[in-house]
Amino acid sequence: MADTTGRIPLWLIGTVTGTLVIGLIGIFFYGSYSGLGSSL
């Protein structure tokens, strides 16, 4: 399926955005918990 240039599947968008959001929240909480939140 090379026809994903103009139409990206919704499940792919949801998976990517969900992973990014969870990753950012995890990094933020981990950084603030370990005392590195102020350096971000």
Curated annotation (Swiss-Prot):
Positions of transmembrane segments: 8-28
Cited Gene3D superfamilies: 6.10.250.2070
Matches recorded under Pfam families: PsbJ
Entry keyword annotation includes Signal: no
Membrane topology: Single-pass membrane protein
Chief place of localization: plastid
Keywords: Chloroplast, Membrane, Photosynthesis, Photosystem II, Plastid, Reaction center, Thylakoid, Transmembrane, Transmembrane helix
A biological-process GO annotation: photosynthesis
Keyword Plastid included in the entry's annotation: yes
Matching InterPro entries: PSII_PsbJ, PSII_PsbJ_sf
Places the protein is found: Plastid, Chloroplast thylakoid membrane
Domain of life of the organism encoding this protein: Eukaryota
Ranges in a coiled coil: none
A Gene Ontology term for the protein's cellular component: photosystem II reaction center
Record note on quaternary structure: PSII is composed of 1 copy each of membrane proteins PsbA, PsbB, PsbC, PsbD, PsbE, PsbF, PsbH, PsbI, PsbJ, PsbK, PsbL, PsbM, PsbT, PsbX, PsbY, PsbZ, Psb30/Ycf12, at least 3 peripheral proteins of the oxygen-evolving complex and a large number of cofactors. It forms dimeric complexes.
HAMAP family (alphabetical): PSII_PsbJ (MF_01305)
Described function: One of the components of the core complex of photosystem II (PSII). PSII is a light-driven water:plastoquinone oxidoreductase that uses light energy to abstract electrons from H(2)O, generating O(2) and a proton gradient subsequently used for ATP formation. It consists of a core antenna complex that captures photons, and an electron transfer chain that converts photonic excitation into a charge separation.
Protein family according to the UniProt entry: Belongs to the PsbJ family.
Protein known as: Photosystem II reaction center protein J
Organism for this UniProt entry: Cycas taitungensis (Prince sago)
